[in-house]
Amino acid sequence: MGKLIKLITTLTVLVSLLQYCCEFNSGSISCERTQTLCHYTNPRVWNTYFSRNCELYKNKVSPGFDIVARKYDTAVKPVIDDATVKVNKVAIQPAFKVIHSQCKKWNCGKYYQLGRSPMVKTRRFFFAKYNAFVKPNLDKFFTAEFRSHLKERILKYKNIGHYYFTITSRCIKSKYDFTVGNTEEKLMGKFKNKDTHGIHGSVTREPSSEDMVLTVSTMESDEEELTTTSTQTVVETITLDQEEASAVANHAHDDEASTDVEGSTDVNVNEQALLQEDFDMWSETILQKTQDVIQLFEKDVSKYINGKLVEEANHFKAKFQSLDDKSKKFFSKISLAINDIECVEGIDSETGKKIFFDKSGSTEISQYITRELVREYFNETRSTLDELTNAMEKDLSEITDEIEKKVNAIREENVEVFEEWGDIIVNEWSKRMAYVDVINAHMGADDDTTLDEEKAKSSVNWKKFLKGKKQIIESRDKLAHHSADLSRVNAFRQKVQKKILSFTQESGEFLYILRSKANLQFQERERKERERKEREKAAAEEFQRQQELLLQQEEEDEEDVSYTSTSTITTTTTMTL
């Protein structure tokens, strides 16, 4: 909330200053964009617009706005105008006169020469550190898409800043011209009015911003396209040699002119000295850059491996859970079949077919459990679990290969970044050395001894340059063959393999136990069946023996009946006789 209040306050102050400048320079503003900006930031314009289009605003807000505007025109604005005139008369005009008079006398040549050398050295130091530490991270995180969006935003805010800068600069320039006249013509007039055979001028035009088209809405919501304008900077360069500088120096002190001429030679000497000093820093920069790229490579690999292993750990956790659930289903199926080995046989009263019940005789089972059926269950369980564990091992191998490929891709990416950095560094150094050689060739000393020394320095510098280039190539090879830390990947793979092996052993042992239990159950059932068959056989034999005894007894009974009948007949016959 505090930031929002600050933003609103800042915008209010800027708009107020803009409106004051627009009112103060209402007759001297020629830029159509500035006129448009003044028009659409004027509160009176928006008050008129809202009053015309909104009844609520017209009845509630507009009367109060009119009262405030009248009070501002009668009470505030006259005070501000009087204060502005007084400040302009008392402070601004005398200050500009003093500054203008001092600018005529002040020659910045000596200060420029004194300050340029350390500034150049500092700039190159920061440039080297930027390329070594900052640029790789920027190249990594600032993608092409992000850069395009950033460029659009920068261009947008650049245009807005350009508007305010143009308005401010024109206000300042109008005040300055009003106070002391056109100082540029006063300062440069004496140079341009002289004979120009000793001065060679060149004018270049460099665009400072792209052409822009601004479309605004008028009060009647009509669209008006303003003329495309282009802001350009005109740079005027005056090149002086030693003889020509003496002609110009008649308007300044002789010692200052000689200082300027000698300063050009000092610049070249400083360039050679800086070049020799920077070669030592270059080697250190290459080593530091190599270490930084290696650290970035290891950091990227570590970050990728951490994320990948966490993801795959969750996947394998789900796979092991699925494997455990399926194994439990198979084991439960086999255990149920083993329990049903000792079943009870019955006869269906309706169909007359055999049906089977569990050993309690209360629950009917789907089928009779045989050795072949249980053996089929065991084979199905073993083959299914083997397929699942083999698939997990295959997935583990594919994940390992994927990680190795990604690590190689990260290595190649970092190597390409280093190669790009090395190419840029080598090109910049070669351009710099070539520039120094060209300067020395055209502005070298007439003394042969000094010329030989410069040539020797150039030769030494080129040898150092070649050494640095070879160092970059060696560092590139070192990066290309730098091994990544895959210990966590190996540990993860060993952990998964160990868990798979443990599951295989446990499932094998459990299946062995179930197989032994099934064999015991089948042996017990077969023993009982043999005993039952023996009992049935003995019962059958006993029944047959009983039948045979009954038949024999019946035969004996029949013989007894026949003997009794014969005796009776004989006795009867005898008595008759």
Curated annotation (Swiss-Prot):
Domain of life per record: Eukaryota
Location of the region described as Disordered in the Swiss-Prot/TrEMBL record: 525-577
Keywords, in A-Z order: Coiled coil, Mitochondrion, Ribonucleoprotein, Signal, Sporulation
Coiled-coil regions listed: 379-416, 513-561
Major subcellular location class: mitochondrion
Biased composition (Low complexity): 562-577
Any GO BP: sporulation resulting in formation of a cellular spore
Signal peptide feature range: 1-23
Compartments where located: Mitochondrion
Keyword Endoplasmic reticulum in record: no
Keyword Iron-sulfur: no
GO cellular component: mitochondrion; ribonucleoprotein complex
UniProt feature, compositional bias: Basic and acidic residues: 525-545
Similarity comment: Belongs to the SHE10 family.
Description of how the protein assembles with itself and partners: Component of the mitochondria-localized RNase mitochondrial RNA-processing (RNase MRP) composed of one single RNA encoded by the NME1 gene and at least 31 proteins. Absent in the nucleus-localized RNase MRP (NuMRP).
The protein's role, per its UniProt record: Involved in spore wall assembly. May be a component of the mitochondrial RNase MRP (MtMRP), a ribonucleoprotein endoribonuclease involved in the cleaving RNA transcripts to generate primers for DNA replication in mitochondria.
Official protein name in the record: Outer spore wall assembly protein SHE10
Source organism of this protein record: Saccharomyces cerevisiae (strain JAY291)
